[in-house]
Amino acid sequence: MADVVWAVRHGERRDSVDPDWETVAERVHDPPLTELGRWAAWRVGRRFVEREPPVDAVYASPFLRAVETAAEITAETDARFMLEPGLGEHRNADWFDAEPETLPFERLTARFERLSADHEPLVTPGFPETHAEAMTRIGRTTRQIADATDGTALLVGHGATIGGVVAGLVGSADAVDAPLCGLTRLVSDDDGWRLDFSGDTTHLDV
């Protein structure tokens, strides 16, 4: 079982800065990172190289912004990562008219050399889902990952992912902060899981 779980939100996404995104997008709800977003993700990777103990397992939401964030991190840490739909975005009916489209797995594995083809998804999200259902789904996924990992796990996802990860392990997301490429750390000891810190972005202060 894992003794440390890290969670990180993806970097800046293109549709947040490009007013023309919806007119040019192949998949309107699956934008890539901006250059700034890739830089911030790279800085997360540098933090793990320079300041933190090694990570034993990396899982990412299948949305492109999270995949690209994981790819930047693992390029620095010389690791591989796995796609886990259970860490994906909240399927909020106010945001999406239907299940949001992401790149097929085959296209992702062809594009990202550090993406492992060996992982079988643990949890498949339903559409639509309430906020409570999304938190439950992400929490269940997190506990399964923690149970399957020896050592340290890093989970790459969305703002909702960070809340679900923390709530799934400690029972509440009240202390969660989820800025772009902010890091949250949870630690397990004899008394169970505790939230060490949330939303740390000191690695971006360069």
Regions flagged by a language model, labelled:
Residues 2-83:
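Active-site-proximal alpha-helix that buttresses catalytic centers in soluble enzyme cores
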